[in-house]
Amino acid sequence: MSKREKRNKSRGSSGHNRKAGSDFMAKNRLKEGVVEAPSGLQYAVVEEVSGDQPESHHNVIIHQRCQLLNGKVIIDTYRENEPSEVAVDELIEGYREGLLLMRKGSRYKFFIPPELAWGKKGSRSKIPPNAVLIFDVRLIDFW
């Protein structure tokens, strides 16, 4: 496949992803328990506890499952039973915003639109352009 054909194919999937993502987010915001922030981030509380909340300068230990709208799993630390350690300020914008809402021990689902994730470019071969990302996150600890 030539570079031009690849570029045109990518543009097609980008447009398809944008439409599918927009349709998904419009329907998802109507579901019971889903909250939409002014930024466009949508989230649902799966399990809430009364712990402390992290701040943007913290490092966190989290369990996470990230998947695309088509169900393709990008990462699943629950299955691997190996939580991730990350710096909050290094996360994509939508993930960071959602994580700062959480309390230690809680579990949330984030529905992150492309403009709060990797946008038009995507991320390498794992995340296509204009992809909505669905994260299932448990905040284990932070410091």
Model-derived segments and spans:
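Cross-family detector of peptidyl-prolyl cis-trans isomerase
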Residues: 1-143
